[in-house]
Amino acid sequence: MKEFFFMAGMQRSGATILSAILNQNPDVWASPASPLFRMMTTQIQSHNELENIDYNRSEAIDNVIKNIPHIFYADKKAKYIIDKNLNWPNPVGAELIFKYITRNIKFICPVRNVLDVITSFDTVINSTDSKNNIMDEQVLKNTFADKPLADRRADFLMRHDKDIALSLEFMKHSTLPQFRHLFHFVDYDDFISDPEREINKIYDFLEIPKFNHKYENIVDTSGISRESLTGIKDLHTIRPTIQKVSRRPEDVLLPETIKRYSGLEFWRELR
């Protein structure tokens, strides 16, 4: 029987390379962004269907939902599955896990300075292959043309209904004492400076046997596409070596944008 863990966290925070390293261990499979959460929430609606109200099969429906993770990962031989979706730490996700998957809830959360995340997005979008992309179309349509494009992108990315703000909101459940033990944060800068230490901390958190990982010539075996639905290429492409290649936010964003999105790294107060 497979054991399930969960990865949430922020975009552009090293989740892809972190997963690539963990996947060197044949007993571990860390997925790219996965549809498992949506699949399970969709099936929960079956409880409210008219057919189930007339002929109650709620217990059978629950059994089907419980089996979805095992069927979904039936092609993986790994003992330990780390399913990635930013929604897992929200109340619906946590309840799904507790009721249908495991009582041993553990969230791995790659995180990064918010301004560095914004700057990293800007860097990737400005690459030659990504000049024309869906996200910029939305940025131009939904932000005011009173500031440079980089700052308009920042405002768009930080909207309450976009992934950065959502992931921050969901992870803030870790600030509640009764939920703190469910979360393990992997800060991008800590990971870059000492990846072996951070990987070992993950094993300690998951309470599974350690593995002798390699930190050079890293290969992503997940099969995730280089293309993105946003039109931004190489969002998930990793380098073979672990290094920080990034511009400074001060070189990209206006001072008022930097001020607006500074100091949001609440997890640093939890250590």
Where are these regions (language model features)?
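PAPS-dependent sulfotransferases, especially Golgi type II membrane carbohydrate sulfotransferases
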Residues: 1-5, 147, 153-158, 172-177, ...
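PAPS-dependent sulfotransferase catalytic domain
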Residues: 86-213, 229-235
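Residue-level preference for the first positions of well-ordered beta-strands
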Residues: 4-6, 79-82, 183
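PAPS-dependent sulfotransferase catalytic core
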Residues: 1-75, 221-226, 232-235
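C-terminal/domain-terminus segments
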Residues: 41-42, 191, 266-271
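CE4/NodB-like, metal-dependent polysaccharide N-deacetylase domain
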Residues: 65-77, 167-178
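Glycine-rich phosphate-binding loop used to anchor ATP phosphates in small-molecule kinases
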Residues: 69-94
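Hydrophobic residues in well-ordered beta-strands that form the structural core
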Residues: 30-32, 82, 109
